[in-house]
Amino acid sequence: MRVSSTEEESYHQGTASMSTAGAVDDDGARFTPAPPQTSLSVTEPARETPVHAVTQVLVVGGGPAGFAAALAARRAGASEVLLVERYNHLGGLSTGGLVIWIDRMTDWSGRLVIAGIGQELLERLPAHAVAGAPRELWGSTEEDPVAYWRERQGAFRDTVTWSPMIDPEWLKYLSQEMLIEAGVKFLLHSWVAEPLFDESERRLRGVTFESKEGRRAILAEQVIDATGDLDLCARAGLEFEADAKTGGSASLIA
């Protein structure tokens, strides 16, 4: 490894940090990497990276979006789906971050308006792993139920809603089981390092990732970026939409 500098300064080994912060412009999203904290640069030696797998669909990120994308892709007929997650569990912030409250899956009349895979998962959880208003109270405006569920984040605007809280450990387990049942393969403890970008077609063709086994690559026909900040698309220079006010972004197929 060679270290170079544009200034006369020495290189000291020690704790290093890397920022992946970016700026979102007012018109949409433009990834702007944070500037380095030094003028040093490192030249890494060229190397061949072994290909761990070749798959039809690769999903990067095992949070709620990545979980649903992988499951939906397999159910839609994809022959092979592989999901890569950096932590030791699925669920993202829902499980590891303890964001276990789902805000209003019903409208003010009590009609279920957010369903699909999310509701399927909730219905498969054991009763003791989900806390929320019973179905017969959804949309109720009666004083006593509203007062009771308001204290439990289940009633708003004097209306009882389906706003469940979920046991995060059960959510980890069931998410994994549902992927296994569907035939989705997944890698945990695997941090995606770089996108493999096809300049001629302007699309992602895979990724390199790091794990206990070192750096490897995955090649795919389709890549779904389900990272929290669309890290892959940003690094590849692809355009994407983001919410300038909240910094949120949507998953993207590239």
Feature locations, PLM:
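Conserved N-terminal/central alpha/beta ligand/cofactor-binding core
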Residues: 16, 22-31, 36, 46, ...
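The conserved SAM/SAH-binding core of class I Rossmann-like methyltransferase domains
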Residues: 60, 84-85
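N-terminal Rossmann-fold NAD(P) dinucleotide-binding loop
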Residues: 66
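Aromatic pocket-lining residues of Rossmann-like dinucleotide-binding sites
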Residues: 73
